[in-house]
A protein has these predicted regions:
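Leucine-biased recognition of intrinsically disordered, low-complexity hydrophobic segments
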Residues: 13-15, 23, 30, 37, ...
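Short amphipathic alpha-helices and their capping/turn segments at secondary-structure boundaries
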Residues: 122-128
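Short, conserved "active-site rim" segments that organize catalytic pockets and cofactor/ligand binding
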Residues: 63-122
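Intrinsic-disorder-associated, low-complexity terminal segments enriched in Asp/Asn/His/Tyr and depleted
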Residues: 19-20, 26, 32, 36-40, ...
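Basic/polar, cationic surfaces and motifs that engage anionic cell-wall
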Residues: 63-76, 80, 110-114, 130-135, ...
């Protein structure tokens, strides 16, 4: 599936979560990397819900084919007490923003589950002028009950985000971890100081 619940594996998020790759009915299709990378007709939702197998790290780099310099953290701007699950967020991006898929690469719900969004090799749609060389991570929340900006992350969300960021830094050791606010001061997102908290 496209979800991972923090606590199932400890203490690290398993690399196989990031290395998941869809299975094809014809194994020979794996040999054609260009065909695999250029296929946009099938939505990521259906790809991510197929059976998956682990991919070696070196194969992952062949799949990504882009330089990652930033890991950008976002919030969904959802008030406390309300839900915005992965599929709802994805539908909103497709129907109301005109995207072909959810704009983020990872989405973390309040229960700590990490949902895979866009494939890492695909450019996201989450931070203007910085999408080409970045990975976007969004957590559900970011607003208090009265709709003011606030760090509403649950302990499970914090644990999942930390584990995910550590694994991504293993893959991209030179990438800077920043918040959306650090690149666009007009926005309070992600409603906490990501640079200070994830200085590793």
């Amino acid at each position: 599936t496209s979800r991972f619940r923090w606590g199932t594996f400890s203490p690290w998020l398993p690399l196989q979560f990031i290395y998941y790759q869809p299975l094809k009915q014809n194994s020979n299709e794996f040999k054609n990397k260009e065909k695999h990378l250029d296929t946009d007709s099938e939505s990521n939702y259906h790809r991510s819900h197929r059976r998956c197998r682990r991919t070696r790290p070196e194969r992952l780099y062949l799949m990504i084919m882009r330089t990652i310099t930033l890991i950008i953290i976002h919030c969904s701007a959802t008030p406390e007490g309300r839900r915005l699950d992965f599929e709802t967020c994805r539908r909103d991006h497709i129907r109301h923003r005109g995207f072909t898929d959810i704009g983020y690469h990872f989405y973390i719900t309040r229960d700590g589950e990490i949902h895979r969004g866009r494939p890492l090799e695909k450019v996201g749609a989450h931070c203007k002028n910085h999408n080409r060389h970045s990975i976007g991570i969004c957590y559900e929340g970011g607003l208090s009950a009265d709709c003011t900006p606030a760090d509403t992350r649950t302990l499970m969300q914090k644990g999942s985000m930390l584990a995910l960021l550590r694994e991504l830094r293993l893959l991209f050791p030179k990438a800077l971890i920043v918040g959306h606010h650090d690149l666009n001061s007009v926005k309070p997102c992600p409603c906490f100081d990501a640079v200070k908290e994830y200085r590793f």
